[in-house]
C-alpha cells in the first residue's frame, strides 16, 4: 500500500511543504526539531487541514484541496501513535485497548484483543494503570490500541524517544514484526538517523 503525499501545511506564519511517494513498508520523516514532521503526520491523520495539496494512501484519497475532499479522521482508517502516547490515565491497560477496538467497525477488525495482547506480550499488563508502566510497556500498549482500531496504515510519532537501549530494541522488533507479519504500511517520525537507517524503506527529509 503506497503513500502519495503532496501538501502544504501552515503553522502560524510558516508553510511546510512535503512531497513524497513510497511503495509501502516503513516510510520515515526525518529532520531537525521544527522541520514540521509532526505537522505532516497530523495532516495524514486528519487532525490538521493542509492549506493545499493532496494525500492518498493505497489509492484512497484522504485529502484533495482542488477536489474538495477532506475525510474526517474516523474515516481514514489509520492507527495513530502519538509522541506523548495519550493513554487514558483513569483507565487500566485493558480499558485503553478496548477504546481502540471500539473505534473499528467489525468489518475492519483483523486482530482480536487476545491476539494483540499475545503479539505485543502485554497480557500481564491488562490490569495495570498507565502510570505504573515502564516507557517500553506504555509504548507497546499504545501500539496495541492503534492496532485494535483496525487500521489500513499506522502513523507513529517518535516511537523510540526516551527509551533505554533494551526497550528501544524491543520496540524496534515490534515495528519490524508489524511490517513483516501484519503487512501494515507505517509512516514514522524520527530525528534519529541510526534508527531510520535500520528501519526505513523510504526516507523523506524535511528541513526547517
Residue ranges and their predicted role:
Residues 60-63, 108-125, 176-177:
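Conserved ABC ATPase "signature" region
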Residues 62-79, 103:
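ABC ATPase NBD coupling module
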Residues 91-111, 119:
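ABC-type ATPase nucleotide-binding domains, specifically the catalytic core motifs of the NBD
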Residues 129-133, 137-139:
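Conserved ABC ATPase signature
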Residues 148-152:
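A short, proline-enriched helix->beta-strand linker immediately N-terminal to the Walker B motif
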Residues 154-158:
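Catalytic Walker B motif of ABC-type/P-loop ATPase nucleotide-binding domains
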Residues 183-189:
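Conserved H-loop
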Amino acid at each position: 500500500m503506497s503513500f502519495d503525499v503532496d501538501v502544504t501545511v501552515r503553522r502560524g506564519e510558516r508553510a511546510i511543504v512535503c512531497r513524497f511517494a513510497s511503495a509501502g513498508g516503513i516510510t520515515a520523516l526525518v529532520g531537525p526539531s521544527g522541520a514540521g514532521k509532526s505537522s505532516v503526520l497530523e495532516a495524514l491523520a486528519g487532525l490538521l487541514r493542509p492549506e493545499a495539496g493532496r494525500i492518498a494512501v493505497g489509492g484512497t484519497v484522504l485529502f484533495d484541496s482542488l477536489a474538495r475532499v477532506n475525510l474526517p479522521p474516523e474515516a481514514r482508517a489509520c492507527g495513530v501513535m502519538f509522541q506523548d502516547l495519550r493513554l487514558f490515565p483513569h483507565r487500566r491497560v485493558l480499558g485503553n485497548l478496548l477504546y481502540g477496538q471500539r473505534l473499528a467497525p467489525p468489518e475492519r477488525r483483523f486482530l482480536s484483543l487476545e491476539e494483540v495482547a499475545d503479539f505485543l506480550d502485554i497480557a500481564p499488563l491488562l490490569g495495570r494503570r498507565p502510570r505504573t508502566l515502564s516507557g517500553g510497556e506504555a509504548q507497546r500498549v499504545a501500539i496495541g490500541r492503534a492496532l485494535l482500531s483496525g487500521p489500513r496504515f499506522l502513523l507513529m510519532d517518535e516511537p523510540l524517544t526516551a527509551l533505554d537501549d533494551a526497550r528501544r530494541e524491543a520496540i524496534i522488533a515490534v515495528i519490524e514484526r508489524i511490517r513483516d507479519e501484519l503487512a501494515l504500511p507505517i509512516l514514522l517520525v524520527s530525528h534519529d538517523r541510526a534508527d531510520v537507517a535500520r528501519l526505513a524503506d523510504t526516507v523523506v527529509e524535511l528541513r526547517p
